[in-house]
Every structure is written in structure tokens, then in C-alpha cells.
Amino acid sequence: MDKDLLKIGFIFIAVVSGLIVFSKFSKSSWPAPQQFVACNRIPDFSSYPVSQVYPGKIRSVDLESNTMAKEMSAQILASTGSAVNFGGNYYLVSGNMCGQSCDRHAIIDVKTGQILLYGLDTTGGVEIRRDSHLIKTNPTGRDPTRYYDFKDNKLLYLCEEPK
């Protein structure tokens, strides 16, 4: 009987410890919409231009700059040597880290190798441009299409279109 209680105690401690660790690393640095804001006018990439596109490539990625992103380290490290694909001097990397029909995304500063943002989950991918700081999430898929403005290393939720 005492051994059974001891086993139950260890299991309880393991579960609680796992929940605490999981809650620390599952948080996202991406802003969730505070409330549904319908798009009065659909944002277009040309309305969010960058002044120039950085010509260099990622020399190395600093995984310590965002510890939450370590769960996607293989995909992030594979981006070494990549050129800008978004917002003038950023590289947006995607990985299937959140389920069968879900992708998780991170934004890396190509100049510094720092992981600026991590944890945006989408079911319909993202649409980005090298010369624009607009991010369009879920252009396909079941979830609403959301629009974000990524400027000065900050992400601002703009609006969304229901499906």
C-alpha cells in the first residue's frame, strides 16, 4: 500500500513538473488578436513597403536569443546561409511543430542571426514578400486570414477576414 502511494506521489510530481515546464516554453511571442477586427479594406503588400532589401545572408543563428525556439532548432539552423525572404532584412522559417495540419513560424534577423519572434501557428501557411513588412496568415485553410504588420522588430495585428 505504501509503495502504491509513493508511486502515485511520484507520478503526480512528474505531471505537475511537466505542466510547469510545458507552460514556460509553449508561450508565444506573437500577439494574439485581442478581439476579431474585420478588415475594412484588405491590406496589400504594396502598402507596407520596406526602404531597402538587405543583400546579405544569415551567417549563423543565435538560438539563445529565443529559448522557446529551440524546439524548432533543426529548421532554424538549416536557415543558415539563407537570404532575406521577408520584410527587407528578415527570414521567416516554418516547421511542422504543432500538429498534422499546423505550421509554426519564426522570424530571424538576417543581419544579426537573432530569433526575433517565435510561435505563430497557422493552418493555412503564410504569405510574405521580400520588399514588404506585411504578413498574411492562413491565406488557405480553415482559419481566418489574419494580417500583421512587422515593423521595427514588433508585430502588430491589423485585421482578419473570416472564411
Regions found by a protein language model. Name each.
Residues 89-92, 133-135:
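Acidic/hydrophobic-patterned starts of short beta strands in beta-sheet-rich repeat architectures
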Residues 118-163:
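Short aromatic loop motif centered on NTY/YTY
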